[in-house]
Amino acid sequence: KELTETIDCFFTGGYKLATREYKGNAPESWLYWEDEKTGEKFNENKYRDYYFGEGLAPITKGYYYGWASSLEIGLMKDGKVVPIGYLSGLTDEIKANPLDYKYKVIEVGAMELTEDGKLRHGKMLGFRDDKDYMECSLEQLK
């Protein structure tokens, strides 16, 4: 179902941790590396060592810092939290401290609502400090 209006929902406190493997196209300028034998992490350009087979692997920034990669969002129904998906593309502050944002109300846009009740391509548009999470009803999706 196509969504034409924004939704007010909240962060549930659930999140997914960042993946390890860096899949970018520019490892020669990348700053986050891990020694594959010892697990030691480096925040400096180690491309030369990587290129010459020194056992280093580029890792994602989120993995380096132990951040969340996406946070779960939800709505309320009959006093219970109903998860409606995960949001990525969040600020470093939010990803670094996901539990600090539990129950914070946000305005979200999305391409559509899937058949199983999840948002597809959700995007955070901003915080709604004027609302309590209990006001974020599943009824918005009908």
Q: What kind of feature is each model-predicted range?
A:
Residues 1-111, 122-128:
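Nucleic-acid 5′ end/cap handling module spanning
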Residues 111-142:
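C-terminal accessory nucleic-acid interaction domains of nucleic acid-metabolism proteins
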